[in-house]
UniProtKB/Swiss-Prot annotation:
One of its GO terms (biological process) is bacterial-type flagellum-dependent cell motility. The basal body constitutes a major portion of the flagellar organelle and consists of four rings (L,P,S, and M) mounted on a central rod. The lineage of its organism: Bacteria, Pseudomonadati, Pseudomonadota, Gammaproteobacteria, Enterobacterales. Belongs to the FlgI family. It comes from Escherichia coli O1:K1 / APEC. The keyword Transmembrane helix does not apply. Its main location: periplasm. It comes from the Bacteria. GO terms for cellular component: bacterial-type flagellum basal body, distal rod, P ring; outer membrane-bounded periplasmic space. Keywords: Bacterial flagellum, Periplasm, Signal. Pfam families: FlgI. Assembles around the rod to form the L-ring and probably protects the motor/basal body from shearing forces during rotation. It is found in: Periplasm; Bacterial flagellum basal body. NCBIfam families: PRK05303.1. This is Flagellar P-ring protein.
């Protein structure tokens, strides 16, 4: 009884340690993809926050063209100074196997100098693909996530007001031709290139479906032999995508975002022992205007403004800090926090660590 319990416990621990994931979570089917759509349109119904038509002539031109299509003629030379209209760009993604009559979400972004799109309504806008064919028509009320107010020359704003979203705001009018079901092979594409994972997925499919059913072509592509016909391939892919494979350890990687100052690392990152000295140099410039006036108000003279500039330079830190070898992510974070460096300083420290061979990871700067 004890032996059976220990065997079950060991099997549970081994199963837990080997992290298994479905093939559907690791790959995508080549050719089954989204397609981008774009369009140009008008938003009306704004509460005085639209384009200044004197500075955005394309808004007035678009409005005139739309009115003429509706049978309304605007006299030549009319200066329409409207504040409730804005020219916008509309973008959307056409999903794979999208059918006529289905709805998709659209994103609306101001093109001119409109202050806000809150409360606006997008007029019927054709959405085109790269082949200049119309695949969807967008129209509806815009939902803006930001908020803002202004009065007396002061203003406050939270989030973006010049862009919004229309849920189910476009109707698909044209379907994309699909090659699915044609031929006897399909390619599975890994989300991240990995020779080991590609071969492991091919071996898993071959064990279940028979030798020769799958072949790893490169670090990202696995070619699978499938039966002909749409319904047969759908059933075949449904079975394959639910197969589970053991996930190999990821590559150690540190990602640095220079724009936001953020540093992200995965659990495979390790450190070797090293010593780090980081000096912080700060320069402060203060500029002050001094006003000099004559003492005798009736004796002539002129008021003079003289600028006074003061520059302070401070350098702190610079002490040598020892960083111990760390084999786990928690220890790596603890060692880096012990340096007391800011995120911006940490970027240069990590780059120097990699150059010195102390950081066992790929460094990616975005």
């Amino acid at each position: 009884m004890v032996i059976k319990f220990l065997s079950a416990l060991i099997l549970l621990l081994v199963t837990t340690a080997a992290q298994a994931e479905r093939i559907r979570d690791l790959t995508s089917v080549q050719g089954v993809r989204q397609n981008s759509l774009i369009g140009y349109g008008l938003v009306v119904g704004l509460d005085g926050t639209g384009d200044q038509t004197t500075q955005t002539p394309f808004t007035t031109q678009t409005l005139n063209n739309m009115l003429s299509q509706l049978g309304i003629t605007v006299p030549t030379g009319t200066n329409m100074q409207l504040k409730n209209v804005a020219a916008v760009m509309v973008t959307a993604s056409l999903p794979p196997f999208g059918r006529q009559g289905q709805t998709i979400d659209v994103v609306v972004s101001s093109m001119g100098n409109a202050k806000s799109l809150r409360g606006g309504t997008l007029l019927m806008t054709p959405l085109k693909g790269v082949d200049s064919q119309v695949y969807a028509l967008a129209q509806g009320n815009i939902l803006v996530g930001g908020a803002g107010a202004s009065a007396g020359g002061s203003s406050v704003q939270v989030n973006q007001l010049n862009g919004g979203r229309i849920t189910n705001g476009a109707v698909i009018e044209r379907e994309l031709p699909s090659q699915f079901g044609v031929g006897n092979t399909l390619n599975l594409q890994l989300n991240d290139e990995d020779f080991s994972m590609a071969q492991q997925i091919a071996d898993t499919i071959n064990r279940v479906r028979g030798y020769g059913s799958a072949t790893a072509l490169d670090a990202r592509t696995i070619q699978v032999r499938v039966p002909s016909g749409n319904s047969s391939q759908v059933r075949f892919l449904a079975d394959i995508q639910n197969m589970q494979v053991n996930v190999t350890p990821q590559d150690a990687k540190v990602v640095i975002n220079l724009r936001t100052g953020s540093v992200v690392m995965n659990r495979e990152v390790t450190l070797d022992s090293c010593a780090v000295a980081q000096g912080n140099l700060s320069v402060t410039v203060n500029r002050q205007a001094n006003v000099s006036q004559p003492d005798t108000p009736f004796g002539g003279g002129q008021t003079v403004v003289t600028p006074q500039t003061q520059i302070d330079l401070r350098q702190s830190g610079g002490s040598l800090q020892s960083v111990r070898s760390s084999a786990s992510l928690n220890n790596v974070v603890r060692a880096l926090n012990a340096l007391g460096a800011t995120p911006m300083d940490l970027m240069s420290i990590l780059q120097s660590m990699q150059s010195a061979g102390c950081l066992r990871a790929k460094l990616e700067i975005i």
